[in-house]
Design a protein with these regions (language model features):
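Active-site loop/helix belt of alpha/beta enzymes
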Residues: 1-4, 9-131, 192-194
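C-terminal accessory subdomain/extension
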Residues: 126-245
Length: 245
């Protein structure tokens, strides 16, 4: 026997759920099974655009079904942090739990990313003007260049689609991806930061560069990058011990 059942209404996403005209019947069937703790739920298709016609249509349909329900859940991260007013008992946070970029937060607040994808420089070499780096010779040196090899590639979850110029963070500043992403390695132009050397830590995404910035260079979204980290990549978890940690 289930203590609680969540009943999904398809208000416009059209993936799962009962259409509004079917909700009353579905709820009655659950009640007949002595299931009284029923939470109505739905999902926004365009929460990043609170004034869109689709969002307004979904809100209208939601209003038609939620009035008779004791509890409901509609808002995802974007709806929760945006300007969408809903009547509900529960919100469902996903991307915002990672500190991902969302619509503007009230009061000018921002979210702090909780995922840092990091590595260290494993090799450094100089190449002459006209020499290329990586598969296919996509990146070509326009000056004598100092190239760093970083042991992280698409086998670890770094996107193969990343373009030349994708930012990579270091303690001395930002460097740029130079050459195609390999399975186990990427390369970066560190000519302008002579203090960088073998062993220097790098941030592929995290505080800087932000995951959504990297995603923009890969023609994807930060949500996808969060899910791409492979099993072989070591995880290090930090326990928060206070408000300032």
């Amino acid at each position: 026997q289930f203590e609680q059942v969540w009943l999904k209404c398809d208000t416009g996403m059209h993936r799962l759920g009962f259409i509004p005209d079917e909700i009353t019947s579905a709820r009655s069937r659950l009640t007949a099974l002595s299931l009284s703790d029923i939470v109505m739920m739905s999902h926004f298709a365009d929460a990043e655009a609170p004034d869109s016609a689709l969002t307004e249509r979904q809100l209208l349909r939601w209003g038609q079904v939620i009035d008779a329900a004791p509890a409901g859940s509609f808002s995802n991260s974007a709806a929760t942090t945006g300007q969408i007013a809903t009547t509900e008992s529960w919100v469902r946070l996903g991307y915002s739990m990672y500190g991902g970029s969302l619509v503007a937060l009230p009061g000018g607040y921002s979210l702090k990313p909780v995922m840092q994808f990091e590595s260290r420089i494993a090799s450094v070499r100089w190449i002459d003007v006209g020499e290329s780096v990586g598969y296919g010779g996509r990146w070509v040196a326009r000056r004598r260049s100092r190239i760093a090899t970083i042991p992280a590639g698409y086998g670890d979850g770094y996107p193969r689609a990343a373009r030349d110029g994708t930012p990579i963070g270091t303690e001395k500043g930002t460097v740029l991806l130079a050459g195609k992403v390999s399975m186990d390695m990427i390369t970066a132009d560190i000519t302008d930061l002579p203090a960088l050397d073998v062993g220097s830590p790098v941030t592929l995404w995290g505080d800087s560069p932000y995951i959504d910035e990297v995603a923009g260079y890969c023609d994807t979204i930060g949500y996808e990058l969060c899910t791409r980290i492979t099993q072989r990549t070591p995880r290090l978890f930090h326990r928060l011990t206070g408000e300032r940690d």
